[in-house]
């Protein structure tokens, strides 16, 4: 195998959107074109019992939302495609943000009837911060939606990114006729047996259709006042190519996929803690753990560490360094994924995502290297939780299951764990309420450990250096605790309590995470 050629083939991207914009549906259609599933359109089939391929966890099937990030791989048109399907629900932003550290591009799915929504904006900010390319898919043209020009304007005004339409809708909803493909200079037809027609045939096909007349006017306006197409600006994350289509009816998706693969970047390098970039074509293997998932197969109570390969080639059985612990590990049981199905892998290269069976060796953010290389990649973002709950085992006889469940789910990063300094009570912190619900559901379903949870409300969290800590700093306005790394942390009742503390101890430095 020529490793350089293999790396060049890789296209690794995440799909981001607000809940219900159609992200899971478009994922299914892409897998359908990749030959990974026989039948697309099984998303949210609650009555029929068919569920989206990427929504594999029990609670996701019940609710019809993605709460973990799935990893799926397929080959198409000479490229090896790695899709990371991220949770659309806002409470799972932590897992999503970390996943966005492991990709080279993002596909942003927008509901054309609703435009840019809150969660899309949040996720876009992370992608923009990383400077990776964003490709936009305006979805649900099979329903009535907003004017295409308004949608482009929203991209520029709300997200602050220039846009270039690759195609343009001819009508919408019941009046939807197809797409005027500006990039390929052809018509893509929604109805009839023929899929494509030449632009010259447009007048003959659509006659005096008012929507087609409108399209011609819009395109004239875009040619005069729109942005110029620039591959350089796309790769720099400064210009987003915009595709219109309908994932549900599988219209415009294949055109999108083929054009996307043409312009999406090859695997990029990754920055070490000293600021140096590790090149994907370096011969030495390196990678980082961006996600840990327990119980992907409940029958085996397994844990998988998801690793983005940054450089070189993985070979089954290879030994790696784990600089965080100073120890080594052997990568013998490694898989690649199609949501919940998996297959053992013997080789993988930079750009690929592999799953390493984990018995508790790895943590999110770990760097893996080989040979004399002992460097670490820049740390992944960690997030300050906003709401807290006390948690304890309902049945004292189930303490062992309770502790195992908490340990594994916390290592996944699903919730954050704190321990009261004085009472040793367990407290959980989360970005949003849904995280607690998922935690409770999984503790009971996967670990057979019922839990008692009592709300503590919102807290303002700040870390303190161990050498600055004096237990007398604890008061009725704060809770002194330890995080899961045994670092001291204060949970303040509110901003007033934080300011009061800062005034009382002006020399003490308090640290805030993202």
From Swiss-Prot:
Main location: cytoplasm
Annotated positions binding GTP: 17-24, 85-89, 139-142
GO CC term (a single one): cytosol
Gene3D superfamilies: P-loop containing nucleotide triphosphate hydrolases, Peptide chain release factor 3, domain III, Translation factors
Domain of life: Bacteria
GO BP terms: regulation of translational termination
Localization terms from the record: Cytoplasm
Domain tr-type G: 8-268
A Pfam family: EF-G_D2
Keywords assigned by UniProt, alphabetized: Cytoplasm, GTP-binding, Nucleotide-binding, Protein biosynthesis
GO molecular function, one term: GTPase activity
Purpose of the protein: Increases the formation of ribosomal termination complexes and stimulates activities of RF-1 and RF-2. It binds guanine nucleotides and has strong preference for UGA stop codons. It may interact directly with the ribosome. The stimulation of RF-1 and RF-2 is significantly reduced by GTP and GDP, but not by GMP.
HAMAP family per the UniProt record, alphabetical: Rel_fac_3
UniProt-recorded name of the protein: Peptide chain release factor 3
């Amino acid at each position: 195998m020529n490793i350089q050629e293999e790396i060049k083939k890789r296209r690794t991207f995440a799909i981001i959107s607000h809940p219900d914009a159609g992200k899971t549906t478009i994922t299914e259609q892409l897998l359908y074109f990749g030959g990974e599933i026989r039948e697309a359109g099984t998303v949210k089939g609650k009555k029929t019992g068919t569920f989206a391929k990427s929504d594999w966890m029990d609670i996701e099937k019940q609710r019809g939302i993605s709460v973990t990030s799935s990893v799926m791989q397929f080959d198409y048109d000479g490229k090896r495609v790695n899709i990371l399907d991220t949770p659309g629900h806002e409470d799972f932003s932590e897992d999503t943000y970390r996943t966005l550290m492991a990709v080279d591009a993002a596909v942003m799915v927008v509901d054309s009837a609703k435009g840019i929504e809150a969660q899309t904006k949040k996720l876009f900010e992370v992608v923009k911060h990383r400077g990776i390319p964003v490709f936009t898919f305006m979805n649900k043209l099979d329903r009535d939606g907003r004017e295409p020009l308004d949608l482009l304007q929203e991209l520029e005004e709300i997200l602050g990114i220039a846009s270039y339409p690759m195609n343009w809708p001819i009508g919408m909803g019941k009046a939807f006729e197809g797409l005027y493909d500006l990039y390929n200079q052809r018509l893509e037809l929604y109805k009839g047996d023929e899929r494509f027609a030449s632009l010259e045939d447009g007048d003959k096909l659509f006659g005096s259709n008012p929507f087609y007349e409108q399209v011609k006017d819009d395109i004239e306006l875009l040619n005069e006042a729109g942005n110029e197409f620039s591959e350089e600006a796309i790769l720099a994350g400064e210009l987003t190519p915009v595709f219109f289509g309908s994932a549900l009816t599988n219209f415009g998706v294949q055109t999108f996929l083929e054009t996307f693969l043409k312009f999406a970047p090859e695997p990029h390098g990754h920055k070490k803690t000293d600021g140096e970039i590790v090149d994907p074509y370096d011969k030495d293997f390196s990678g980082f753990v961006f996600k840990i998932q327990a119980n992907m197969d409940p029958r085996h109570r397994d844990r998988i560490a998801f690793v983005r390969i940054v450089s070189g080639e993985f070979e089954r059985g290879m030994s790696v360094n784990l600089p965080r612990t100073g120890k080594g590990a052997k990568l013998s049981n490694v898989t690649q994924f199609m949501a919940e199905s998996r297959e053992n892998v013997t080789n993988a290269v930079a750009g690929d995502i592999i799953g390493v069976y984990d018995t508790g060796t790895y943590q999110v953010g770990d760097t893996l290297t080989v040979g004399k290389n002992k460097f670490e990649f820049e740390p992944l973002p960690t997030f300050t939780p906003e709401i807290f709950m006390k948690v304890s085992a309902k049945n004292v006889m189930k303490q062992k299951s309770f502790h195992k469940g908490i340990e594994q789910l916390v290592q996944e990063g699903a919730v954050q764990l704190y321990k009261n300094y004085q009472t040793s009570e367990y407290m959980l912190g989360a970005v949003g309420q849904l995280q607690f619900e998922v935690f409770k559901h999984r503790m009971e379903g996967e670990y057979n450990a019922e839990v008692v949870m009592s709300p503590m409300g919102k807290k303002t969290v700040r870390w303190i250096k161990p050498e600055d800590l004096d237990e007398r700093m604890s008061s009725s306005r704060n809770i002194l605790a330890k995080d899961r790394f045994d670092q001291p942390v204060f949970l303040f009742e509110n901003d007033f309590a934080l300011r009061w503390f800062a005034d009382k101890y002006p020399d003490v430095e308090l640290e805030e995470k993202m």
